[in-house]
């Protein structure tokens, strides 16, 4: 991939560019962009201190497709990694189509005025990306994403058969605060208050938020 543009300078964006800098043989040229460039500069300073790698920074309002297109043309990346808010997914996908650049995100699109989990908005882009010869890798955060890689590795290298697979997503850390989230607080609250969905009896079953519990050892 070599040259990559990361949009979004929150907690996830910070972790991502630090990890990219640790793998400079793959990500040899990194640009971090956000609406507030001061956040990008602070992260870039941390990356330099921790890894010795210099990353570029830029300002962009990802709600503005034309501005995002202009930045992509200026940077010339092979891949745009969208770590901004889910509200901006479609705008950034439009910008990637306009510039002929591959796309990756970690969270599915949601409209600003409605907390609704729905893949269809982004899946509707499939033909356009395919016809343009471009990749759009969606939802490759932790669940799914990292957990899928873990499960595939276990299946391929460690176990002969798998009967069931339970994925427990929790945070064992302590921020020392009464309330702290792992990523954008608004999105986090949307997720935990949304109707729950689980796979049971060969189909998806939906229920009220926080209506199911499971004990584990």
Where are the predicted features?
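Conserved Rossmann-fold cofactor-binding substructure of NAD(P)-dependent oxidoreductases
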Residues: 61-77, 84, 88
């Amino acid at each position: 991939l070599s040259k990559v543009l990361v949009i979004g300078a929150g907690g996830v964006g910070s972790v991502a560019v630090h990890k990219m800098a640790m793998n400079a043989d793959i990500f040899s040229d990194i640009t971090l962009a956000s609406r507030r460039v001061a956040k990008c500069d602070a992260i870039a300073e941390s990356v330099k201190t921790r890894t010795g790698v210099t990353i570029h920074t830029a300002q962009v309002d990802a709600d503005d497709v034309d501005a995002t297109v202009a930045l992509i043309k200026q940077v010339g990346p092979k891949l745009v990694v969208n770590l901004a808010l889910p509200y901006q997914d479609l705008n950034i996908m439009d910008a990637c189509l306009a510039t002929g650049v591959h796309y990756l995100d970690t969270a599915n699109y949601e409209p600003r005025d409605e907390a609704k989990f729905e893949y269809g908005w982004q899946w509707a882009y499939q033909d356009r990306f395919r016809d343009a010869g471009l990749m759009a890798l969606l939802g490759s955060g932790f669940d799914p994403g990292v957990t899928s890689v873990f499960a595939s590795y276990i299946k391929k290298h460690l176990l002969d058969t798998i009967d069931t697979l339970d994925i427990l997503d929790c945070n064992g850390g302590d921020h020392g605060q009464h309330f702290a989230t792992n990523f954008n607080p608004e999105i986090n609250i949307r997720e935990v208050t949304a109707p729950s969905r689980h796979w049971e009896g060969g189909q998806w079953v939906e229920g009220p938020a926080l209506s199911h519990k499971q004990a584990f050892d």
